[in-house]
Each structure stands twice: as C-alpha cells, then as structure tokens.
Amino acid sequence: MAKIKIMPCLDMREGRVVKGVHFVDIADAGDPVECAKAYCAAGADELALLDITATVEKRATLADVVKRVAEVCTVPFTVGGGINSVEAAGVVLKAGANKISTSSAAFRNPQLIPDLIKEFGVDAVTVAIDVDVNPALPSGYEVYIDGGRTATGFDAVEFAKKVDGYGIKTILPTSKAGDGAKTGYDLPVIKAMHDVCNAEIVASGGAGKLEHFAEAAEAGATVLLAASVFHFHMIDIPELKRYLADRNFDVAL
C-alpha cells in the first residue's frame, strides 16, 4: 500500500489565506506564513499554496508570498495559480517552491507540460484539473478552467489520461461541486483517474470529516488535500493521521 500524505492547501488572495465554497463566497483564514508554520509543526507531509485569482486576473503568482512561506516551510511545497509559462514557473521555483502546479494554461496549451518537465524535471510539475459533473460526457465529468469559471466541454478523465501520457507524476483533480462544501471528496472522479493513470492522484475538494479522508484513500488517492477543515480547526492533522493509521493506512506519524 502506498504511503498516504496529508496536504493542507493555502488558497491565496491579496496576500491572505482565504477559503470559499464552490470556488466563491470567500472568507479570510489567516496569514500564509503563520499558517505554513503551524501546518509544518502539526505534521503536514506536504503543503500547497494556490493563488486563486492569478489566472483570471492575468498576472503572475505572488512570488514575494512564496518566498516568505518557503522560508518557514519544512515540507515539500507546491505553488499554483498563474503558472502559464516556463518563465513563470521558474520565478516561483526560484522563490523557494519545490513544485509548481499548472491548470488552465496546461489545458489551453498541453505542450507546456513537456516543456516544464524538460526544464525543471518531472518531480517538480503537478497538473491540476478542476472538474464538475456533466452527464453528457463519457466519464460524467467536465474540465473547467479559469478558477472554475469556464466550462470547456472536454471530458476530465480523458484529459487526465492525456496528461498522464506525458509522464507526469502528480495529477490534482478538484471537484467544483465539492470545493469547501465539506460533504466529502468526489470519489468517482478520484477512482476513474486512478484507474487510467500511472500518476499519483491528489484528492481535493470536499473534505468535511475524518471518514472522507479514508474514503478518498480507498478510492485511490495517495495525497489528501484539504483547506477549510484545517484552517478553521475542525480537524487537526495528528488526529487525522491517527484515524488513518488505526484503519491500516500507511501514514507518517
């Protein structure tokens, strides 16, 4: 059984950690540096920072925030939002990120994926895919871009297969319906992508209670990403890891 990793996500807007529901209704959740320090101390295995408005505002990711977070972060640290070129990725990695995550740009220009891998190595590149339900598509899921604002008409699982074909090691699907709703991860999309991809699948969007994390791991996710439940102290990381370990999942305690 693969080791299960816990990944708090810092959704950023205007230099602050925020959290929304279904990608909107945004609430402030704190200072990114303080959040990062707290999560690392609590036993997070990885950390994500997502600049949620960089793409739609057509600007670069907040490199100064990345630098400040990187200075206190003691675990692998992924940054996404506005990564639309090799140059933009280089700025973020130079600022201290270990990995970058690209989403809308990778959909619009899939050649960006091998270009990033060639420049920075496959371990430094994650492809994120925002998805929502669309029964008209073969998998029942559609790719959304621009922070979940724009439907593409493209099947999400087919796109994951295409991404996987580039040799990418990490795919991060986020359920638009589940985002911030705390009703559980979208298990069918996790399982569908796990079944057709060699890449590890990050579960994202919908965690609300301990059982949801175990369900996602059972569906095939090896990285369990969450935001609201950690930011607002509904679940703490040591408690979550003990819960998973008690159910025979391999976690670093």
Task: Walk through the language-model features, giving the residues of each.
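Conserved, mostly hydrophobic/aromatic
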Residues: 11, 39, 47, 79, ...
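Conserved anion-binding
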Residues: 12-14, 18-19, 93, 97-173, ...
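Glycine-rich, proline-tolerant flexible connector loops at the mouths of alpha/beta enzymes
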Residues: 46-65, 104, 172-183
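Charged helix-capping and loop-helix junction motifs
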Residues: 60-67, 110, 152-157, 183-191
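Catalytic cores of alpha/beta
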Residues: 73, 77-100, 188-224
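Hydrophobic faces of well-ordered beta-strands that scaffold small-molecule active sites
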Residues: 5-10, 19, 47-49, 77-81, ...
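C-terminal helical cap(s) of enzyme catalytic domains, especially alpha/beta-barrels
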Residues: 112-120, 214-253
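Glycine/small-residue-rich loop that forms an oxyanion/phosphate-binding "nest" at active or ligand-binding sites
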Residues: 53, 61-122
